[in-house]
């Protein structure tokens, strides 16, 4: 910073840029000189003694370099804007942001209320899933009942009422009271169809055979196997294999009578033959925590076709009461478990 004395005794503080104008001002002066708008005499004048006569000096004072800032004025021409407009713009922006915030809070509240409203639907989904599973099981049991007993279209009381009114039993499968049919047959009622007589005789003979076997003190494994086979549908199923395992272990432990009694008791309670076999593995002590027997076979083709879909990888410690019937071991050492 240097200090120089101007004409008329005024002293002003100037910077290096004041004495050496920038290229912008020099270019502008050159353009004005070449076009003749500024006389040459105005340029080559006594700047020190007559600064007021110099056009360039006036232009330097009235049009300063935008890149420089005078020490007396702190206003930058680039920032020479209306601050009121900036304030108004910021205020409007703040208003918009506030409105968006309010809208977001309202949307969040609506989403929360919607979630609260959907909670009963979530709970209902569990109930529907449970009902679906139970209904599927019930339909499967009903189909099994229809296949094994025929579709009953009326109760025993309704059958008796129809028979008494029309003088003949209703068409199709129906439920009959054993004592009522016995009385009709013994009284030689001519309205009893031949098919009903044959069915009653077969039922009567089966009952007597069951009572005979049930009262037999020592039942053989072969007889017990045949009795269980007679109750099972199909052939070579996993339950047929389970019958063989039950009879084999029962014979080794002298528990055939207990197994037979348990089987008949389950049937008397209304259980299916398959369910009765499973109950034996869970109720008779010799099957609790018992490992399934290992059966050596040459190839997978030796396993009955009805058992193929029930084969599973063998777990570390299979148990009969957990549904593992037996373990098939192939010649190459690979094992397959039969699971029900």
From Swiss-Prot:
A GO CC annotation given for this chain: viral nucleocapsid
Keyword terms, alphabetized: Coiled coil, Host cytoplasm, Host-virus interaction, Inhibition of host IKBKE by virus, Inhibition of host innate immune response by virus, Inhibition of host IRF7 by virus, Inhibition of host RLR pathway by virus, Inhibition of host TBK1 by virus, Inhibition of host TLR pathway by virus, Interferon antiviral system evasion, Isopeptide bond, Phosphoprotein, RNA-binding, Suppressor of RNA silencing, Transcription, Ubl conjugation, Viral immunoevasion, Viral RNA replication, Virion
Post-translational modification note: Phosphorylated by host IKBKE. Phosphorylation contributes to efficient viral replication and transcription.
Residues forming coiled coils: 96-116
VP35 IID domain ranges (all copies): 215-340
Region listing for NP binding region, in residue ranges: 33-48
Main location: virion
Annotated GO MF terms: molecular sequestering activity; RNA binding
InterPro entries, sorted: Filo_VP35 (IPR002953), VP35_IID (IPR031163), VP35_IID_b-sht (IPR043061), VP35_IID_hlx (IPR043060)
Effect on the protein upon substituting residue 309 to R: Partial loss of the ability to efficiently antagonize the type I IFN response
Phenotypic consequence of residue 12 to V: In strain: Isolate mouse-adapted
Keyword Zinc appears in the UniProt entry: no
Consequence of substituting residue 210 to D: No effect on viral transcription and binding to the nucleoprotein
Gene Ontology biological-process annotations: negative regulation of gene expression; negative regulation of miRNA-mediated gene silencing; positive regulation of protein sumoylation; symbiont-mediated suppression of host antigen processing and presentation of peptide antigen via MHC class II; symbiont-mediated suppression of host cytoplasmic pattern recognition receptor signaling pathway via inhibition of IKBKE activity; symbiont-mediated suppression of host cytoplasmic pattern recognition receptor signaling pathway via inhibition of IRF7 activity; symbiont-mediated suppression of host cytoplasmic pattern recognition receptor signaling pathway via inhibition of TBK1 activity; symbiont-mediated suppression of host defenses
CDD domains assigned to the protein according to its UniProt record, in alphabetical order: V35-RBD_P-protein-C_like
Disordered: annotated span: 1-24, 33-48
Crosslink site: Glycyl lysine isopeptide (Lys-Gly) (interchain with G-Cter in ubiquitin): 309
Motif (Required for host DYNLL1 interaction): 71-75
Function: Plays an essential role in viral RNA synthesis and also a role in suppressing innate immune signaling. Acts as a polymerase cofactor in the RNA polymerase transcription and replication complexes. Serves as nucleoprotein/NP monomer chaperone prior to the formation of the large oligomeric RNA-bound complexes. Regulates RNA synthesis by modulating NP-RNA interactions and interacting with DYNLL1. VP35-NP interaction controls the switch between RNA-bound NP and free NP and thus the switch between genome replication and genome packaging into the nucleocapsid.
Domain notes for this protein: The interferon inhibitory domain (IID) binds dsRNA.
Subunit structure: Homodimer. Homooligomer; via the coiled coil domain. Interacts with nucleoprotein NP and polymerase L; VP35 bridges L and NP and allows the formation of the polymerase complex. Also interacts with VP30; this interaction is regulated by VP30 phosphorylation. Interacts with host IKBKE and TBK1; the interactions lead to inhibition of cellular antiviral response by blocking necessary interactions of IKBKE and TBK1 with their substrate IRF3.
Protein name: Polymerase cofactor VP35
Upper taxonomic lineage: Viruses, Riboviria, Orthornavirae, Negarnaviricota, Haploviricotina
